[in-house]
Amino acid sequence: MKSLSFLNHEFEAFPSPELALNDPNGLLAIGGDLRPERLLSAYYNGIFPWFNSDDPILWWSPDPRAVFIPGEVHISTSLRKYLKKQPWRITINHAFTDVMAGCAQPREKQSGTWITQEIQMAYRELHHTGHAHSIEVWEGERLIGGLYGLAIGQVFCGESMFHRKTNASKAAVAALQQHLLKMGFKLIDAQVMNPHLESLGAKGIKRIDFITLLRELRNNPVDPATWTTKEVILELE
């Protein structure tokens, strides 16, 4: 029987994702905190936090799950041509805090953000410990787009992206895919499907299949140099 779990501030194991509610889709647990060990345990088990500033902490594992396969992200011919013309520079882990702040800005027709100060502090700590990473897109010295997420073995768990110029977030996605392919990653978790992700080639897979893939990949080693601060040259041929 599916039922909602309530977490206290003592560290405890998450319930199985299979126990998540159908309505709302994927809600698994309420409460707890955003300590690094709890966040890492969540992602390690296919669970992520998502809540508004006036909500308690909510933990989710939706079914279906939106994913990308590195190498199958759709970069259209017109987008390739557009990106080739731009004098943009793309980097890894140069400005994690600024990327999170950009992602936290309310979108058009939205009054608030789920990327609260509490969330930003928690993920900055994960960045400092080498678990959370960012891709930045620059025009000169101005940050015009980017994304951030967590690396769990050979899985990259995407959290959010933003742009201040047209297609800058898509440039970040293209750079992420290129980098992950080179570093041997097998899966990008995009969490919940939406039209934008679908246009980029995201697929919805059953939660049980996602968890199976995650268990196969989460302990696989990756090159320690994968997330050193560096510049990425987009290969768009």
Curated annotation (Swiss-Prot):
GO molecular function: leucyl-tRNA--protein transferase activity
EC main group: transferase
Catalytic activity: N-terminal L-lysyl-[protein] + L-leucyl-tRNA(Leu) = N-terminal L-leucyl-L-lysyl-[protein] + tRNA(Leu) + H(+); N-terminal L-arginyl-[protein] + L-leucyl-tRNA(Leu) = N-terminal L-leucyl-L-arginyl-[protein] + tRNA(Leu) + H(+); L-phenylalanyl-tRNA(Phe) + an N-terminal L-alpha-aminoacyl-[protein] = an N-terminal L-phenylalanyl-L-alpha-aminoacyl-[protein] + tRNA(Phe)
Main subcellular location of this protein, as a coarse class: cytoplasm
Single Gene Ontology BP annotation: protein catabolic process
GO cellular component: cytoplasm
Keyword annotations: Acyltransferase, Cytoplasm, Transferase
Keyword Ubl conjugation: no
Entry superkingdom: Bacteria
EC number(s) per entry: 2.3.2.6
Localization per Swiss-Prot or TrEMBL: Cytoplasm
Family: Belongs to the L/F-transferase family.
General function of this protein: Functions in the N-end rule pathway of protein degradation where it conjugates Leu, Phe and, less efficiently, Met from aminoacyl-tRNAs to the N-termini of proteins containing an N-terminal arginine or lysine.
Protein name: Leucyl/phenylalanyl-tRNA--protein transferase
